């Protein structure tokens, strides 16, 4: 009887326990599922964040690399295609002076006073800086001849200057001209006549073109183009050197027949280093463009050969009679005038009035 009574209780207890287990099971399973899903999601998020971080780091490195390469190529192309003008654009004279001559040394004070003299007394407002090398005097003169559209000297109108190299050799027996040196190239040999002919031919062609051009702005644009080509420039300057040599040779032959010649040539041939055209070429002319520029007597010969009055403001001679000089000293009145300025008789720039 006792066992019979306890059976329902056991069944009731069993049903209660079973229900609790079912409830616990229903709670535990979703919890485990959610936990598993969370772990998977967290792992996925961490993986995604790691990939994103790596991707951002890669693109940042790529961006920096490409930026560096782009900057390098931009600089290269700018250097490659930028016009390397050997005669720069106009700069305000006093601003140029202030930039170049700072401090209170006696030299700096002298230069500032000289530039102020140019500005106030001679009305020079700007300066065109010229590339500093051993051709700068020739460059400064030729640039102004072309930019002003000056015509040929009278003697060049009467002769075909392209044939002058052969004329010196065959008509005047100057076989020593084979020792002519083309500035830093130091070229000598049997082909020197061909090289000189090409140089003189280029000078004649360019001079003819500029002198026939009436548009000032067009001449300026063409000058900027021409004076940014170093190879063409050198050929033009060698042509000018040869014309100087030709004039020296012509005057030397005239002196043999006791003809009256300009005093500057007597001074030239009185020097121990240039008693004749060959010595002048070997000891002076061949070095121009290579180890030295034009000295004062060379400037005289250049002005005489091109039939221009070269007025030079020698700033280091401020407050003296040699502050402004002409090459040659007694030019003919009808010769056109061009102006240069120098701080030391070695480097020349172009004043703009």
From Swiss-Prot:
Region feature Required for membrane binding, mapped onto this chain: 1-80
Span of domain OTU: 125-353
Subcellular location, record wording: Cytoplasm; Endoplasmic reticulum membrane; Nucleus envelope
Signal peptide: none
One GO CC annotation: cytoplasmic side of endoplasmic reticulum membrane
Membrane topology: Peripheral membrane protein
InterPro entries in alphabetical order: FAM105, OTULINL
Keywords (A to Z) from UniProt: Cytoplasm, Endoplasmic reticulum, Membrane, Nucleus
Domain of life: Eukaryota
Gene Ontology biological process terms from the UniProt entry: protein linear deubiquitination
Quaternary structure, from the entry: Does not bind ubiquitin or ubiquitin-like proteins.
Comment block on domains: The N-terminal region that precedes the OTU domain mediates interaction with cellular membranes.
Protein family according to the UniProt entry: Belongs to the peptidase C65 family. Otulin subfamily.
Function of the protein: Lacks deubiquitinase activity.
PANTHER family cross-referenced by the UniProt entry: INACTIVE UBIQUITIN THIOESTERASE OTULINL, OTU DEUBIQUITINASE WITH LINEAR LINKAGE-SPECIFICITY A-RELATED
Protein name: Inactive ubiquitin thioesterase OTULINL
